């Protein structure tokens, strides 16, 4: 493990704050948002899962901007274990351009979650579809899943439709 990775891990574990990590990685004068984007570059080059987690923790505070939605491609890679963090962070963003991401995320199962009977990623992706219910495709996908034979996914879709009908 190199110094970058050690410092990233220590930050992810809460041992050092993000501000200190930024200084140690020579990003002291960079905004937290831009630093999160840099963390994703570091994550990809080093295949460092902790850096992905940290980046999306930062995006959770600063809201991933539409021009950066391409960064979500990292979600579909299997070398990290930050899939739940990514979809959770993004599920709170209202933007019709995210609907296809949520649809794909529902059916994506990373190898380390192959035995996940709770379908944690899919559930969070359904929250994202619910957040974007005003988008025609989101409503279409929720209705399609609500009428599907996939019991768990059907349940998640119905849950979102019922929740949203009470608003």
Predicted features, each with a name:
Residues 30-41, 62-76, 95-111, 135-146, ...:
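Amphipathic alpha-helical scaffolding segments comprising HEAT/armadillo-like alpha-solenoid repeats
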Residues 78-79, 110, 118, 149-151:
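Short inter-helical turns and helix N-cap capping residues of alpha-solenoid HEAT/ARM repeat scaffolds
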Residues 1-43:
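N-terminal "cap/leader" segments of large eukaryotic alpha-helical scaffolds
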Residues 146-158:
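Short glycine/proline-enriched turn or capping motifs at secondary-structure junctions
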Residues 18-28, 41, 49-63, 73, ...:
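Structural detector for internal amphipathic alpha-helices that build alpha-solenoid repeat scaffolds
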Residues 44-48, 79-80, 137, 150:
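Residue-level recognition of short, well-ordered coil/turn positions
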